[in-house]
Amino acid sequence: PFRRYQISKVYRGERAQRGRFREFYQADIDIIGDGKLDILNEAEIPAIIYKVFRGFGLSWFQIRVNNRKILNGFYAMLGLSEKSGDIMRTVDKLDKIGADKVRLILLEDCGLTDDQADEILRFIAITGSNAQVLSALEGYAGRNEMFDQGLSELKAVTVNLAAFGVPEENFAVDLTIARGLDYYTGTVYETTLLDHPEIGSVCSGGRYDNLAGYYIDKALPGVGISIGLTRLFYVLDEQGLLNPALPSAPADALVLPMTDSPAAAIALAETIRSAGLRVQLYGEQKKFKQKMAYANKLEVPFVVLLGEDEIAEGVCSVKNMATGEQ
């Protein structure tokens, strides 16, 4: 599979409010298969979420997991296959608008009967431990093939999540999770900070089998998540979990060649990199003062100077940019 991640700015047309912005940074992580993609990947994605959030020093978060095949299958049992998309988008608003308003939309906008709306609300209200929710879902099994497939996949994801070392207090089977975008086809996720419910989801995603089909005539099933970094860092900053001592410079050291031939400087930079440090090599033929001005702008902690004398002696000069010591 093709495994990729990126961090970039994204834009969304929504009302700006606490923790929600129209322009923000987002991290995307995806695994794309060629023709098929094993269910194991649908557990690895939330396992990555767990490790990232624990790495940030967060513990009070919950990865809520569901499978859209279960929802589609259940709606089919009620004779509502043609309205499943509208129903899912409505159910996805449950946390924001509450059960009463969801029921009203199901009745007035989706055209459901009272019995159908009540049946859906009872279904998504199934709660308990992961084992208890899965056991309750077994009571619906055998009536719809898609439902049964989704239940089988959800069971596999929960088993594999435990194998990845994700504790149950950090993930929960939650039948209210639907994701409003129609391209999701299987497992779906939403991650919330339990001590900041007003922020909403800070990380979400799911399985998408047919998304590439909008662009190319080839099956490229995938699964992925997006982390709202700006929203998340807003909370981390409030809680004092952002470490200002972490390096902000793009490199640990800047190597400044002081000769016309860069060969020795290139070799030195590679040697330092092999030791696990981040190194930037200055390649412009400029005056020493301009080179040091660049180093100051870069805010690197160390500058490595390599001139003719250093090359001849097999040494280099290192300047501590904070103290000025060399």
Range-by-range predicted roles:
Residues L71-N72:
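Short, well-ordered alpha-helical microsegments
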Residues P1-S59, I105-Q326:
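Positively charged, Gly/Ser-enriched RNA/tRNA-binding surfaces
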Residues R64:
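Ligand-site clamp/hinge motif
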Residues G79-L107, L193-D195:
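Acidic, His- and aromatic-enriched active-site or binding-groove loops in soluble protein domains
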Residues I49, L78, G85, D100, ...:
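Juxtamembrane helix-loop transition sites at the ends of transmembrane segments
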